[in-house]
């Protein structure tokens, strides 16, 4: 299981990596392949800053809502190459990170004692 504190750290790391991925992996072409991870990464950083867990600046969003956003983002990232039609250009980073995001959601401890 992943503690809530570890999940918080993972959120910030994944958010930054998603923003940088198109530039580091060579698909910063201005299309959906580039913008989907950038926007999802920025979203992760923003809602992580206001989630009710350690390492946030305001405790506004409950963990359950945060995990729902993570799951939705992971699923969108996973299917985005086919949904937005760029699978012929690049698909593996989106699929790998999408699956990892879903796995982190499933393995995160949800009880407050685990925080």
Predicted regions: what is each one?
Residues 65-80:
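Hydrophobic alpha-helical membrane segments
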Residues 4, 84, 101-115:
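Membrane-water interface at the C-terminal end of transmembrane alpha helices
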Residues 79-93:
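Membrane-helix boundary connector in multi-pass membrane proteins
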Residues 33-66, 103, 107-112:
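A low-complexity, Ser/Thr/Gly/Pro-enriched, surface-exposed linker/loop concept
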Residues 12-32:
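Membrane-helix boundary elements
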Residues 2-5, 28-32, 54-64, 85-88:
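Juxtamembrane loop-transmembrane helix junctions in multi-pass integral membrane proteins
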Residues 7-10, 28-40:
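A loop-to-helix transmembrane entry motif
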């Amino acid at each position: 299981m992943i503690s809530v504190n570890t999940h918080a750290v993972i959120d910030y790391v994944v958010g930054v990596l998603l923003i940088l991925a198109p530039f580091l992996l060579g698909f910063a072409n201005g299309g959906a392949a580039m913008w989907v991870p950038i926007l999802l990464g920025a979203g992760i950083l923003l809602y992580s800053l206001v989630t009710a867990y350690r390492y946030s600046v305001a405790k506004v969003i409950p963990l359950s809502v945060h995990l729902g956003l993570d799951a939705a983002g992971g699923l969108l990232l996973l299917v985005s190459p086919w949904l937005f039609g760029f699978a012929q250009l690049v698909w593996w980073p989106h699929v790998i990170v999408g699956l990892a995001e879903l796995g982190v959601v499933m393995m995160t401890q949800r009880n407050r004692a685990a925080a």
